Regions:
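Short glycine/proline-enriched loop/turn "hinge" motifs that connect secondary-structure elements
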Residues: 35-41, 188, 252-255, 289
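Periplasmic N-terminal accessory/gating domains of Gram-negative outer-membrane beta-barrel systems
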Residues: 16-27
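Predominantly transmembrane beta-strands of Gram-negative outer membrane beta-barrel pores used
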Residues: 23-24, 31-53, 57, 69-75, ...
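Outer-membrane beta-barrel channels and translocator barrels
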Residues: 29, 40-41, 75-79, 161-163, ...
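Structured alpha-helical segments in the cores of large, soluble enzyme domains
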Residues: 28, 32-38, 280-290
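Surface-exposed loop/interface segments of Gram-negative outer-membrane beta-barrel transport/assembly proteins
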Residues: 1-16, 56-153, 169-283
Length: 290
């Protein structure tokens, strides 16, 4: 009847992959917080701790954070003091691709896994199921990134007031930040026409240290009809930063199918960079009002 016969490439595939179900999931979000506070005439305190976890709705994406904070202050005779300390630790495993865009481009006739392709993942071919979309499951399994951040921020102050008109105050603060970024790319492909790549690992670290120290002397007094207030002080600021990056290729695979990703296990293409910066500033200040 003039109707062309069905060709092999037009036949219905044995696969019916629901890429949305493969990539998206119901994510568990957890958020826990506990705090303790109290005090009296001579001082007060506040302590809190928290944990937050988000598994992420897309495949391969997770985030968690630990936090701790303490704040105290007190007074004893001529002395008063206080401090504020905050610490946080975060771990992030981000997506390496736009998973929403990728699963929309993948045909349901393409399986998630295909042992005939390098790495064992399906992504179609030029003869049938032709697409240049990215298999998001393959990419998240073959390319992994983990970011870890530690931060400690704290301040301490101490005031000595032997007379109503005269006081000395010390203030010190630190801000410590440690960042690690680990990336690994295993052997295998996640889309058509990809060039072969050997297993590769990259690691980066940034360490930042900031410090502030202040000393101030305050005078405030009336002399009959006259009034004088004055401030005399000094401040010191110090900053240090160090960055380190390293990369290796050709990592061995263990018996369980995982790679040995320690940088020293990389067998070729060793690359390293290291940078350091440091600066400091000291200032003197004074003011008199009459």
């Amino acid at each position: 009847d003039g109707i062309a016969s069905i060709t092999t490439t037009q036949k219905h595939s044995e696969y019916d992959t629901n890429w949305q179900d493969e990539v998206l999931k119901t994510a568990l979000v957890q958020d826990y917080n506990v705090s303790l506070s109290g005090g009296g005439d001579s001082g007060s305190y506040f302590v809190s701790a928290g944990y937050y976890n988000n598994d992420g709705v897309s495949y391969g994406n997770t985030f968690d954070r630990y936090s701790f904070r303490v704040n105290t202050q007190g007074k004893k005779g001529w002395f008063s003091f206080g401090e504020n300390l905050a610490y946080s630790l975060t771990n992030t495993d981000p997506n390496q691709t736009n998973t929403y865009n990728d699963f929309l481009r993948m045909m349901p006739t393409i399986p998630v896994y295909d042992e005939n392709n390098p790495g064992g993942y399906g992504y179609g071919d030029a003869a049938k199921y032709n697409t240049f979309g990215v298999n998001p499951i393959a990419r998240e399994n073959l390319e992994k990134r983990h970011m870890r951040q530690n931060r400690l921020n704290g301040s301490l102050w101490l005031e000595f007031k032997p007379f109503e008109f005269l006081s000395y105050k010390f203030n010190g603060g630190v801000d410590l930040y440690f960042y690690e970024n680990s990336w690994f790319r295993g052997e295998g492909n996640w889309q058509q026409n990809q060039e072969h790549r050997d297993p590769e690992s990259q690691k980066a670290r940034d360490n930042t240290y900031n410090m502030l120290i202040e000393h101030t002397l305050n005078f405030n007094k009336d002399f009959g009809k006259h009034h004088v207030d004055a401030v005399l002080g000094t401040t010191y600021q110090h900053h240090e930063w160090e960055g380190l990056w390293a990369s290796r290729l050709n990592f061995p695979m263990l018996g369980n199918g995982d790679y040995l990703t320690v940088l020293n296990a990389g067998q070729s293409n060793q690359q390293n960079t290291n940078s350091i910066s440091e600066n400091a500033m000291i200032s003197y200040l004074g003011r008199v009002n009459y």
